Amino acid sequence: MERVERIIEFEIARINSHLPRARKSLKDLLNMEEPMITLRDGSVHYFKRQELELLASLLDEEEIAMLRLPMVLEISTVERDKIIIRGKVEAKVIRKILGFEEAIIEEPILKLPRYYLPKIRRILPTTTVHAFIVEW
């Protein structure tokens, strides 16, 4: 069984090769002439400036410095019908983008039905990325 688990983990790592090696703050990306990051597979991912500016318009200065991009939308093997967004600022942005009311308490984890994934990706195609998470 251990061999099968290693194979599955290898395949998940392969399908997640589009994830960033490191994320950058919205503030740093806004200050770059060509906002970009390097992905795990060595390729470069470019951010659309108008998308970065949209995100900045939703946040205050402190939050702009805190928001790390791209935001990771997790797809879990356990909660297959949900996507998970981690981070207080990230969750706030997604709630605003989807038109949800302000939360009374800002939670650091936001779980949404998976059918929101295409809508989020359509609105924020370069500042979000989905990741497949294996949980046993």
Swiss-Prot record:
Pfam families attached to this UniProt entry: DUF61
Annotated signal sequence range: none
InterPro entries the UniProt entry points to: UPF0216 (IPR002746)
Family, per entry: Belongs to the UPF0216 family.
Protein name listed in UniProt: UPF0216 protein PYRAB16100
Native source species: Pyrococcus abyssi (strain GE5 / Orsay)
